[in-house]
From Swiss-Prot:
Catalytic site: C2, K604
Transmembrane segments: none
GO biological process: carbohydrate metabolic process; fructose 6-phosphate metabolic process; protein N-linked glycosylation; UDP-N-acetylglucosamine metabolic process
Lineage: Bacteria, Pseudomonadati, Pseudomonadota, Gammaproteobacteria, Enterobacterales
Organism: Buchnera aphidicola subsp. Acyrthosiphon pisum (strain APS)
Protein name as annotated: Glutamine--fructose-6-phosphate aminotransferase [isomerizing]
Record-linked InterPro entries: GATase_2_dom (IPR017932), GFAT (IPR005855), GFAT_N (IPR047084), GlmS/AgaS_SIS (IPR035466), GlmS/FrlB_SIS (IPR035490), Ntn_hydrolases_N (IPR029055), SIS_dom (IPR001347), SIS_dom_sf (IPR046348)
Compartments (UniProt record): Cytoplasm
SIS domain mapped to chain residues: 288-428, 460-599
Catalytic activity reported: D-fructose 6-phosphate + L-glutamine = D-glucosamine 6-phosphate + L-glutamate
UniProt keyword Nucleotide-binding, yes or no: no
Amino acid sequence: MCGIVAAVTQRNIANFLIDGIKKLEYRGYDSSGLAVIDNKNNIVRIRCVGKVNELIKKTNKKKILGSIGVAHTRWATHGKVSKENTHPHISSNIIVVHNGIIENNSTLRGFLKKQGYIFSSDTDTEVIAHLLHWEQNKKKDSLIKVIQNSIKKLDGNYSMVVIDQNNPSKLIAARSGSPLIIGLGTEENFIASDQIALLHVTKRFIYLEEGDIAIVARKEINIFNKNNSIIQREEVVSNIEYKSAKKGKYRYYMEKEIHEQPKSIRNTLKNRLTNSNKVHFSELGSKENNIFYNTEHIQIVACGTSYNAAMVSRYWFEELANIPCDVEIASEFSSRKLVVRKKSLLITLSQSGETADTLSALRYSKKLGYLGNLTICNMKSSSLVRESDFYILTKAGLEIGVASTKSFTTQLTVLLLLVAKIINSKKENNNTSKRIVQTLSILPVRIEEILKKKQLIQDMANTLANKKNMLFLGRGNQYPIAMEGALKLKEISYIHAEAYPSGELKHGPLALIDKNIPVIMIAPENSLLEKNKKNIKEICSRGGIVYVFSNQEFDYEENINTIKLPYVEELIAPIFYTIPLQLFAYYVALKKGRDIDQPRHLAKSVTVE
């Protein structure tokens, strides 16, 4: 969500700060700003609504000379989108940027008004700035003590960076819930929400942990934990190449990431398939087999696209490994009383590993008596990975487009590998495990085949781009793929789309069918094909128009349009049929001229509940 970049250096940093938040645009935002303490010890602040390019224009009109400062992209949660609500916020000598939500904002605001503070915005961030200033004036303590005292009064999740004009040689960072990292330089140091903002200047990072406060100067860093004790945090060297954060020959990151899926899946499979057609996850270490041997039930918790991946895997766990599996949306999981089954393994699923609802669910689950918790994630350095008992990495590589593509298909790949691993661990049905391994081995080639069909899918997208509503249908493990197709279309084209199991058509959605609502059906050749054919006839008999993704021809009605795809093995069909739906959503959004990589109101990493 919001993006933070800060630096303390020997050079002028205004342009560096803007470059940093420019690299965080993919996180989603509606306004941006920066504040620098210049060489005359004045605070220079520039804020604007809209794209970072607007901030660049305003900054270029001023020659800002200063070596310490902070920049921010805002995604509105408290207060409308306006210049007044845009960060940084200032209270006399205190500069603050913040990501998160302060839940007792109203109470603190009322208290501070009684102390004589005047508010110029509706944000909870300005509350933090005034609270810090009040604490500083009251006790005359050092800024670190002021922050330690102030955060005790804050309810909610946050990451913040603070600069004191009276001590303009240090940045102070505090983290509770939302991610924050320190980038290590040579006689200069940096802070950011995400390493992508800093990869062009350093590959050395320290990840702040829950409750940490850090004092960051040019040559020195001191970190205090939640008990206010000085602590050393591990330095991590990033393996992400800066060039991977560029679009290359592609117009949008989403297009690039769709085409990277064969490579991403190969990376996900690499060193995990043994010569004996078994699965090995090196991340799990020596406990690898014991974890799964004792598992008698699986509970998966996720949000958004990750939830759809989890829904597919439920079919796999139950049909292939004979293990009961339940899937729940993370925000719902944390808000109700749960009955935990015996020997139940909790699995959390997240691309970023910083999804607030999923993190909250993981923390809640630790009180409930699960056998253990396993996270499947794309970011090794994430909070979810650090707080879980075990983790498996998807190895999708850097994903910048807000709409997930390769992270979804690599999640599905890992989940299917996990099914095979559980079968191996229980020493049951070894033929099924071998079949999974052998089928996954050819998946990248199958996806390369379907990417060659993109012109056919673009033609379909151009035909349907002016529609206001669409209906997606699928049966069995293709129903969650229909859900994912509808979600992708909504996210980037802003066309309303719904997904239903094909068998539910006559239980309500059939009332919507007419020539103006296209029906997108996923109907591969499998045991459910004949049932899908009956649904297609139902739609056509009511004047509906159907677009069918299948390896079979459907030419018995003039209202049927078949997007003929290559045959694919049933085990990997859900992953395979995801690709044309991603392409379809992309080309519809392209035709409509949408901002595909940064769709309105959405964020790549949802770090608030």
